[in-house]
Amino acid sequence: MSKKPKVASNTIALNKRARHEYFIEEEIEAGLELQGWEVKSLRAGKANIGDSYVTFRNGEAFLFGGTITPLNVASTHIVCDPTRTRKLLLNKRELDTLYGKVSRDGFTVVALSLYWKNAWAKVKIGLAKGKKLHDKREDIKDREWQVAKQRIMKNANR
């Protein structure tokens, strides 16, 4: 008999604050250029993308602010930098559209989630526009109203 495949979440890290701070206009999947110790740390779930964003240099995109904590058993002859900038692997067309919108339209690009797709580590990046304080309050009111509405409907059906 063959073994059943493990049912596990493919998500490594989430940036929940990004959806609170920004309006996400578009989401794009990008690959990451990683070193060996980083892949081992990601498999252990030691990643944080809470303050990460994307910048453009020489026609390439780089992820800044993402932290991958090295494992204790990492190699001694390799210097592990947890906060190094990591190159994003995107198509030329995707790079051009993102760069154009960021430079002209006042958008920013933030990391939304880090996950496994087959054996590859991928990052979902979002083209985002910053929210004002009143927008955040409006979102909170809408969320609270949805919860209250569900509660009312649940009690009405009894």
Swiss-Prot record:
One MF term in the entry's GO annotations = RNA binding
Q: Does the keyword Ribonucleoprotein apply?
A: no
Keyword RNA-binding applies: yes
Matching entries from Gene3D superfamilies are given as: 2.40.280.10
Q: Which UniProt keywords apply?
A: Cytoplasm, RNA-binding
Where found in the cell? Cytoplasm
Which PROSITE patterns does the entry link to? SSRP (PS01317)
One Pfam family linked to the record: SmpB
The cellular component terms of Gene Ontology attached to this UniProt record, alphabetical and capped at eight, are:
cytosol
User: Taking the first listed entry, what is the main subcellular location of this protein, grouped into a coarse class?
Assistant: cytoplasm
List the GO biological process terms: trans-translation
Coiled-coil blocks? none
Q: What does this protein do?
A: Required for rescue of stalled ribosomes mediated by trans-translation. Binds to transfer-messenger RNA (tmRNA), required for stable association of tmRNA with ribosomes. tmRNA and SmpB together mimic tRNA shape, replacing the anticodon stem-loop with SmpB. tmRNA is encoded by the ssrA gene; the 2 termini fold to resemble tRNA(Ala) and it encodes a 'tag peptide', a short internal open reading frame. During trans-translation Ala-aminoacylated tmRNA acts like a tRNA, entering the A-site of stalled ribosomes, displacing the stalled mRNA.
Sequence similarity: Belongs to the SmpB family.
Matches recorded under PANTHER family: SSRA-BINDING PROTEIN, TMRNA-BINDING COMPONENT OF TRANS-TRANSLATION TAGGING COMPLEX
Query: This chain belongs to which protein, by name?
Result: SsrA-binding protein
Organism of origin: Glaesserella parasuis serovar 5 (strain SH0165) (Haemophilus parasuis)
